[in-house]
């Protein structure tokens, strides 16, 4: 979703492994009057992490209704993002991907969406200047309402109920009624995603994303942050660059609007498949629930339904790679998902843990590079660094998050490859979920504003700390 509402771009010749091209393209549009024109081949394969709906007929009715809904994004926007990610894969751009661990229906408000977007824009401005390359901004937003879980049930005080799997599946409250998977929530996810996208489009085109305004926010952060003195030099350099351009009479349109794209984990395959459409330009399939989708660590089985689904759509695809990932697996993902080797099609999002990334990542990068594939390498420094505090809160240490990013950069520097970006769980609010940071959060502070429905997120200050510190790393590359 760009600041210019993503004008259509020419569609490059692409893969031929999708379902057969419809005979009469004039009758099939991106709005999918006939979304069932493709055969959902994933349905014949094992699908991990799917809800157990007690009323299957109700699910079928909801899916049929979703199939009639208009797209949330357009194929041309997905193509545009693929081109931007192609630049990331070739070392010509940097990806900033961030947002909630799991979005919540009751958090779809103007203030919370604005604060999240504001934080990402501030991070992007710092990284753009320091890296001297375009920063592709992608939110974990407008669809991240589902979460895979390690256990299917939860027990409290002798009572066992289904695990909370995100607002798209069931309720957070620990009672039988709330925890029963309800397919009606899929429709609510669609409408909440549409409302969020609408507001983000307004913010990114209506002056809120003006680069000079974003820089002013960063100046305020530097002044108020305990770590501000460390960041002051970089902030001053950005200020001088903007003042020079103003004095020279330069006022490009890119200063006033911003390209911003939406992504989420493609977890609930009934929902994703119902929102898969045939593009009238090309006859190819797109998942129009978001510009980019990724397959998670728990659902990336090569013989599973999620990889099969991802292989049939033309969106940019991400794959989460944990420390157990083998070289053969990585190369097979490329063969399955990017057989034509199109830069920007495939992003490897690495979540190794700070203690493993320096040992586990080099061989993967080395062998994938030697294969001739051009993928974008991105670090997720969050998921491999979670622990439980004595209070029972799941949390992460900011220093561990930073160390995994450092290890990621060190590996790429040693191999002469491009550290393509960061994928972070964050919020624009002043929560107390991760410990550490410049404006330090202590373990004993976690209870004060621990608001996440699932995993701990960096707060606004910690997110901006991370951006300035990653900017320093990029300059050292």
Where are these regions (language model features)?
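Glycine-rich, charged/polar anion/phosphate-binding loops
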Residues: 80-82, 303-306, 333, 362-364
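Short coil-to-beta-strand
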Residues: 91-92, 377-379
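Active-site-facing alpha/beta catalytic cores
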Residues: 102-103, 108-353, 393-396, 404, ...
